[in-house]
Curated annotation (Swiss-Prot):
EC top class, as a word: transferase
Protein name: Aminomethyltransferase
Any GO molecular function: aminomethyltransferase activity
GO biological process: glycine decarboxylation via glycine cleavage system
EC number from the UniProt entry: 2.1.2.10
Catalytic function, reaction form: N(6)-[(R)-S(8)-aminomethyldihydrolipoyl]-L-lysyl-[protein] + (6S)-5,6,7,8-tetrahydrofolate = N(6)-[(R)-dihydrolipoyl]-L-lysyl-[protein] + (6R)-5,10-methylene-5,6,7,8-tetrahydrofolate + NH4(+)
Recorded name of the encoding gene: gcvT
Gene Ontology CC entries for this record: cytosol; glycine cleavage complex
Length: 364
């Protein structure tokens, strides 16, 4: 029996096409994935992300615990509400999950983890907490709605009350604030401006309806995937997992090597990987017809004339750009051209940094 979010009936009201997503009944689209994609790039769209898992980490050792648990360093967070992105690694340096951590105070943090990895994440976190004076509390009574797009903030402002609008006025990216019953954060998974709003389940339907009446278009998993891929954002399970280290997943910037004496999980293994060298994640664009898909092979010839091979981790047709884009894990010796094997033919592609569209515009 699939899990249903508190917004399940709202999806049906908007003719959502429901599919199983890691054990959750979630909307793939509400009629047109392309229209939903363009709504977020050009106007405002909203997503039910209530299947994500909110976990509060509270106690005297909360900071010390998270400095051990995460490859990024929460000690960098000094201003209440400031957030950071990073990986939770195993002892081999593999990515257990990628997550966002909000600093609320020196003894209180909030983390948001992926739905597909919830059980293993919670098991790992609870295993690691031994010896720390910390309470780890899952918050299943909270739902979450993401409103994204160039007009998302203005439209959301017509829904929030005066106190909430005052609390978020001028809030920079990657911050969150509790205001009234809502936790409103300037985060997202689309490459557009907007908010992710954590709301008590009892209030979620009314908030969704208010956003709908404010002209924010419901968007499903299909658009969420094309938007995040255009933005060059990883999807756990495709672009990285426990078999992949963050340096090979374009997450090197999220590893805080300093201070050198912070012994975060996986550090020793990752230092060895860094010294020996590892693959990297690149972006690919293809002018030819067709769509690059996950699992296809990538070939290129290195500077020594040796053929090298990599693999597509995520690929799609980009509605914004009008051609196929992909992310691929490849040997570091790759240049700016390669070939992708499609239907037993090799098709030329350009190699770029893994970021294609930001704030509605081409990013390369």
């Amino acid at each position: 029996m699939a899990n249903k979010t508190v917004l399940f009936n709202k999806h049906l009201e908007s003719n959502g096409k429901m599919v199983d997503f890691h054990g959750w009944d979630m909307p793939l689209n509400y009629g047109s994935q392309i229209e939903e994609h363009h709504a977020v790039r050009q106007d405002a769209g909203m997503f039910d992300v209530s299947h994500m898992t909110v976990v509060d980490v509270i106690g005297d050792d909360a900071c010390a615990f998270l400095r051990k648990l995460l490859a990024n360093d929460v000690a960098k967070l000094k201003v209440p509400g400031k957030a950071l992105y990073g990986g939770m690694l195993d002892h081999n340096g593999g990515v257990i999950d990628d997550l966002i951590t909000y600093y609320l105070s020196d003894t209180e943090y909030r983390i948001v983890v992926n739905s597909a990895t919830r059980e293993k994440d919670l098991a790992w976190i609870n295993e690691q907490v031994n010896g720390f004076s910390v309470e780890v509390t899952e918050r299943p009574e909270l739902a979450m709605i993401a409103v994204q797009g160039p007009n998302a903030k203005a439209k959301a402002a017509t829904v929030f009350n005066a106190e909430q609008n005052a609390a978020i006025e001028g809030m920079k990216p990657f911050f969150g604030v509790q205001t009234g019953s809502l936790f409103i954060a300037t985060t997202g998974y689309t490459g557009e401006t907007g908010y992710e709003v954590i709301v008590p389940e009892a209030d979620a339907e009314a908030l969704w309806q208010a956003f709908l009446e404010a002209g924010i278009k419901p968007c499903g998993l299909g658009a969420r995937d094309t938007l995040r891929l255009e933005a060059g954002m990883n999807l756990y399970g495709l672009d990285m997992d426990e078999s992949v280290n963050p340096l090979a997943a374009n997450m090197g910037w999220t590893v805080a090597w300093e201070p050198a004496d912070r012994d975060f999980n996986g550090r020793q293994a990752l230092e060895k990987i860094k010294a020996e060298g590892t693959d990297k994640l690149v972006g690919l664009i293809m002018d030819a017809k067709g769509v690059i898909r996950h699992g296809m092979s990538v070939f290129f010839t290195d500077s020594d004339g040796v053929e090298q091979q990599g693999i597509i981790t995520s690929g799609t047709f980009s509605p914004t750009l009008g051609y196929s884009i992909a992310m691929a894990r490849v040997p570091r010796s790759i240049g700016d051209v390669a070939e992708v094997e499609m239907r037993k033919k090799r098709v030329p592609v350009k190699v770029i940094a893994p970021s294609f569209v930001r704030n509605g515009k081409q990013a390369f």
